[in-house]
Amino acid sequence: MAYSWDNRVKYVVRYMYDIDNNGYLDKNDFECLALRNTLIEGRGEFNSDAYANNQKIMSNLWNEIAELADFNKDGQVTVDEFKQAVQNLCCGKSFDGFPPCFKTVIGRLFKTIDINGDGLAGVDEYRLDCISRSAFSSVKEIDDAYAKLCTDDDKKAGGISLNRYQELYAQFISNPDEKCNAVYLFGPLKEVQ
């Protein structure tokens, strides 16, 4: 159940975008994401120009996501609305077929994971990304998930490139197969309540 399509989409809403933990997406989440991304990209340093840029990007993203997924136009995107939007707009498609706002979100997320800026998400960055959202008592659990996620080419390259990350993310939210390696993109999953 933890790797079912339904749970993966719930996971994305709950742990990736519902920053204020109120159970739905709204404008505030994207305002908080602007600050979060600015601080992560600056490795803790606050840059007002980068923040202004991130505010603009996240405001535009919220407006696009609200247009695509806020079906009842109440200023909130519930988990069910988000799932319906993903099903309508993403299921069965590769990254290239996704709406522009989804592509932007995925690219911005990769930037927050690639802490050292080398263009790859290595095991060290993967570990940090995983523990920022979930509790683990053993690094082996995280490392095993990374090993299942990576192909031989990823391992030779030293990590997951942006292009590979984009395709993995696309599979994570659009592929119903619980056994595809993309289900490990965000680490070992637990069932979202």
UniProtKB/Swiss-Prot annotation:
Positions annotated to bind Ca(2+) 2: D70, N72, D74, Q76, E81
The keyword Transmembrane belongs to this UniProt entry's keyword annotation: no
Pfam families: EF-hand_7
Residues spanning the membrane: none
Thermal profile of function: Stable at wide temperature range (4-100 degrees Celsius). Heating does not cause degradation, but leads to polymerization. The polymer content is highest at around 70 degrees Celsius.
Xref: InterPro entries: EF-hand-dom_pair, EF_Hand_1_Ca_BS, EF_hand_dom
Uses in industry and biotechnology: The Maillard reaction (glycation) and enzymatic cross-linking reaction are effective methods to reduce allergenicity for the industrial production of hypoallergenic crab meat.
Molecular function GO labels: calcium ion binding; protein homodimerization activity
Protein residues bound to Ca(2+) 3: D114, N116, D118, E125
The protein, known as: Sarcoplasmic calcium-binding protein
PROSITE patterns tied to this protein: EF_HAND_1, EF_HAND_2
More about this protein: The sarcoplasmic calcium-binding proteins are abundant in the muscle of arthropods, mollusks, annelids, and protochordates.
SUPFAM superfamilies (UniProt xref): EF-hand (SSF47473)
Subunit details: Monomer and dimer.
Tissues with expression: Skeletal muscle (at protein level).
All residue ranges annotated as the EF-hand domain in the record: 16-40, 57-92, 101-136
